[in-house]
A protein has these predicted regions:
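Extreme N-terminal leader/targeting segments of oxidoreductases
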Residues: 1-17, 32-42
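Glycine-rich Rossmann-fold phosphate-binding loop(s) that bind the pyrophosphate
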Residues: 21-23, 27, 48, 224
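Flavin-dependent oxidoreductases
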Residues: 28, 91-94, 195-203, 209-258
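Glycine-rich FAD pyrophosphate-binding loop
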Residues: 34-57
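Dinucleotide-binding Rossmann-like beta1-alpha1 core, especially the glycine-rich loop
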Residues: 61-145
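A short, glycine/Asx- and small/polar-enriched loop/turn
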Residues: 115, 146-155, 197-205
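Helical element adjacent to the flavin cofactor pocket in flavoenzyme catalytic cores
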Residues: 159-219, 227
């Protein structure tokens, strides 16, 4: 049930918030903002690929883990897990909203040297303080439960099978996008090609679209994912974001797994 996306020019020439990028990140911001009773402003979402064919959202595995080295990343993941498990409640409780589950297949990190092993131990302590179920295992301990691994060159293992795994990210994205539209966020198929800043250089005052429209704005949100650095440069900002390939490998076991 896709939301109809307006093409080309927006309805107005001024918005409180302009979100550049309408995929998972942009639609998340649009939904959370439009759902917040304290926010009464206008929202414009500018998406240059309205079919979402080339965005990272369309290619993600939609997986979540808690095995990070910083508390903020762990807490963000834990909020994500709670959101997935209680998706219907977060979206208003309607029976039309699907119930989602988290398929906790777990994440396993293997250290083949003492330096990385020490890093895994340090990370586990942070994760444990945050309530994550990460366990540090010797190769022998891991082998006892997962006998199909060849661990000859491994010195330490970090494993968490609780609240780490896959969820239906595409469903969340579609409901965010559609609900944000119903709550007043305006989606258009267009592209931001430049920005102008205030006299003191501290604020973006307008964005110019590929159609030539110049839009005044209170706040601009960069939600362009791997293209975020290119978008930021329009505002004279350099950020360390770049697209990188990620690979998923699916193995067929030579012998049936126990």
């Amino acid at each position: 049930m896709p939301t109809a996306i307006k093409t080309h020019s927006p309805e107005h020439t001024s918005y409180d918030v302009v979100i550049i990028g309408g995929a998972m990140l942009g639609s998340s911001v649009a939904w959370f903002l439009s759902s917040n009773p304290d926010f009464t402003g206008s929202i414009l979402v500018v998406e240059k690929d309205p079919a979402y064919e080339f965005c990272s959202t369309a290619h993600t595995n939609s997986c979540v883990r808690q095995q990070f080295s910083t508390e903020i990343n762990i807490r963000i993941s834990q909020f994500t897990i709670d959101f997935v498990k209680n998706f219907r409640d977060y979206m208003g409780g309607s029976p039309d909203v699907p119930d989602l589950t988290l398929q906790s297949f777990g994440y396993l990190y293997l250290a083949d040297n003492d330096s990385f092993a020490d890093e895994l131990r340090a990370r586990q302590k942070v994760q444990e303080r945050c309530g994550a179920g990460t366990k540090i295992l010797t190769p022998e301990e891991l082998k006892a439960d997962y006998g199909f691994y060849n661990l000859d060159d491994i010195v330490l293992c970090s494993l968490n099978t609780e609240n780490e795994g896959y969820f239906e990210g595409s469903t969340i994205f579609e409901w965010w996008r559609r609900s944000a539209g119903k709550q007043g966020a305006e989606y258009i198929a267009n592209e931001v090609i430049s920005m102008t800043k205030s006299a003191n250089g501290q604020k973006i005052e307008t964005v110019t679209l590929a159609t030539g429209d110049v839009i005044s704005c209170g706040t601009v949100i960069n939600a362009t994912g791997p293209r975020a650095a290119l978008t930021a440069r329009m505002a004279g900002i350099d950020i360390p974001v770049e697209p990188r390939k990620r690979y998923t490998f699916i193995f067929a076991a030579e012998r049936p797994l126990d």
